[in-house]
Amino acid sequence: MFLDILRRRNPKFVQAAMALHRDSKIPANSYVIDLDQVRANASTLKGEADRNGLKIFAMTKQVGRSSSFCKAVMGAGIEKSVAVDMACARGTHRAGMAVGHLGHLSQIARAEADAAAATFRPDYWTVFNDTKAGEAASAAAKAGYVQNLLTRIKADGDTFYRGHEGGFDADDIVAVADRLDGLEGGRFAGITTFPALLFDHESRKVKPTPNLSTLTRAAEALASAGRTGIEVNAPGTTSSVLMEGLAQAGATQCEPGNGIHGTTALHVMEDLPELPSVLYLTEVSHLSGG
């Protein structure tokens, strides 16, 4: 569904990929990334995040945690990644990118928690329950620091992809925060969900999910309990044109992924500031029957 958009909005990239393939410099069955455009897209996202007071972490899994991709993103000022699993953390770490957020969507396995803390020291570590919070805090204590813990929360009516369900009950967030503050090596830092924004096929627009309202209510409950500096992590279908709305809803963190290479569903519907900058290269192997 992106081919027409790619050819119209970034034709020189398509032509360059074809030329390099014809010169046998890029094989068939390859993904090709326009690193110059990635850097430009990342710069747009970073600028809009800064304008709205949002911390920004780059999602890199969609392009295989490519080190060249990571370096282009860092060149635009986005210095930290969100690692949905240890593979992401290792890949971005090797590329020289610090891990800003670890453990969301995949929880860090108990046997890998110590290595995650010692090697990556993520700014934030998401946990879905008290057991995982204890493991993260214990690992951080062994590594000699206090880990900022984000709590994945949920409420009735929230929307999750299959296999992504779970988290602390949003109604219990104040008590959860108190418990996490009691962990050696850990401290409660804030709340998260996924997805906070989602493309609506009927209206062909990106809309807030019920999850974003859940985050807002939980943040209000924490503020009413006297807590300040609450981090609100709100990923999902992120483009620069949506950041102002996220900030107005109370978000403090955003995590663009497909937006960095201009391939969210909204990029198909509208010409957004980010241009498409990734393609799959193949070739016609032979003709048969005319």
Predicted regions and their residues:
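Active-site-proximal beta-alpha core segment in soluble small-molecule metabolic enzymes
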Residues: F57-T193, L197-F199
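Charged (often Lys/Glu-rich) extended helix/loop segments that serve as interaction or gating elements
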Residues: G262-G290
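Flexible, glycine- and charge-enriched loops at secondary-structure boundaries
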Residues: Y31, L35, T126, G166, ...
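A non-catalytic, amphipathic alpha-helix used as a structural packing/dimerization or gating element
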Residues: D36-T44, P210, T214-R217
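N-terminal glycine-rich anion-binding loops that anchor highly charged ligand groups
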Residues: V14-M18, V38-Q62
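Active-site loop/helix belt of alpha/beta enzymes
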Residues: A155-L272
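Generic N-terminal amphipathic, Lys/Arg-enriched alpha-helix
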Residues: M1, K12-I33
